Amino acid sequence: MDHLRDSLLSSLPRDSPSIGAMDYARRDRESTRQSVARGDFEELRQAAFYNRTWVVTSRFCDIGAGVDSVEVHVHSLWYIYYELSRHISSQSPEHEGLVLDILRIQGMGPLNRPARGNSGVDIARTVDGTLWTDLPFLVGDMTSFWIEHGATMSGTHRLNLATFLAKLASARVAKDRMCQIALLLFRNVFETSLELRTGDESDGEDLNRGMRQLEVFHLLPAAVAWLKIAAHNLALLSEVCWSDCPSHISQGGEDFLESELGRRSPAGFSPWRYMFWMKRLHEIQGQAKEAGEKTLEELAADGIEYMSNTIQSRNSEIIRAFKSADSALHQDPHLSCLRNLAGFDDDEPEESQEIARES
C-alpha cells in the first residue's frame, strides 16, 4: 500500500526537463556557488528575493508564460536560499533575515493573471502547489539537498542549514511538511546504530563521506537545534501521529523498529517514537559522560530538557501515552524523565501505581 500512498503525496507525472532547462539550472547553480565563494551574501540574497521572484511573476503575469516554464526559476530561488542558509552563521541577524524572506515570499501569493476571454483569472498552480502561497518545491528541494549533501558538508554548515530548516518548520511553512527533514535526521542519529566518536578528526567538509560514515558527533548538534527551535511543532505532530510524507521518509530506523516502542508505533511521528528519541538521548548522554565527551554530554542533556519541557508545558498526549503503557516501559531507566512528568513516585511499588491509574 505504501507505493499507492506515495503516488498521492508525490508530484504529478510529467515530462523530463528539457536539455536547455537542465543546462540553465547547472550554470545558474555554478554562478550561485561562485558568488558564495566570494562572500557576496547580501548581493545574492537581493538577487533571490527581488530578481528571481520578479522573473517568475513577470513571465507568468505579464508575458503569459505557462507555469511549467517558470519552475526552473523557482528551483533556482530555493537553491540560493539553501546555499546562503548553510554558509551564513545561524547565530547572526542575517540568518534570521533569510527565514523572514521565505515568509514574505509566501505572502506574495497567490500569483494570478486575467484569464483568456476576460472571464475570471488563471492561478499559477504547479504540480506542488500554488505560487507563492504554497511555496511549491521548497520542501522537496530542501529535502533533496539534505539527503544529497548533509553527510559531506562541514559540521558548521550542517548546523546552519538545520537551524534554518527548523526555523521554517517552527513557522509551519508548507503545512508542516518541512518537519519531514527532522524525521530523516532523527532516524539517522537516534534510530540507527552509530558510534559516538571514534577519532579526533574535526567535522570539516568531506566530499567522500557518506551517510554510513557519520557518527553521533556529526549529527547531534543539528538534531538538538531542531529540538530547541521546533520543539512544539515536533511534539504536536507526534501527538497526532502525523505522517504526511513519502514512506521512505516516514519509516523508522532499524533500531527503532526492533524496539518495543517501535512495535507500537505507526510510521511518521508518534508518541512512541518521541519517547524513543528521549530514550536515545539519555543513552547518548551516558555514553558521552563515560567517554569524556563533555560537549556531546551537554548537547544530549539540552535535547532531553527541550523535549521534556515542551511536553510538560503542553500537558501532552505523549505523557498520557506513557502513563497507559506497561510496567516494563515505566521501569526503563532511560525514560526516568518521563516517570517524573507522569507523576510516578520512584519509591512507590509499580503495583500500587497501577492500581492508582485504574482507580
From Swiss-Prot:
Record field: compositional bias (Low complexity): 7-18
Pfam families attached to this UniProt entry: DUF3632 (PF12311)
InterPro entries in alphabetical order: OpdG, Oxopyrrolidines_Biosynth-assoc
Disruption phenotype: Does not affect the production of oxopyrrolidines A and B.
PANTHER family associated with the record: NUCLEAR PORE COMPLEX PROTEIN NUP85-RELATED, TRANSCRIPTION FACTOR DOMAIN-CONTAINING PROTEIN
Biological function: Part of the gene cluster that mediates the biosynthesis of oxopyrrolidines, polyketide-amino acid hybrid compounds with feature structures of tetramic acid. Does not seem to play a role in oxopyrrolidines A and B biosynthesis.
Protein's name according to its UniProt entry: Oxopyrrolidines biosynthesis cluster protein G
Species annotation: Penicillium oxalicum (strain 114-2 / CGMCC 5302)
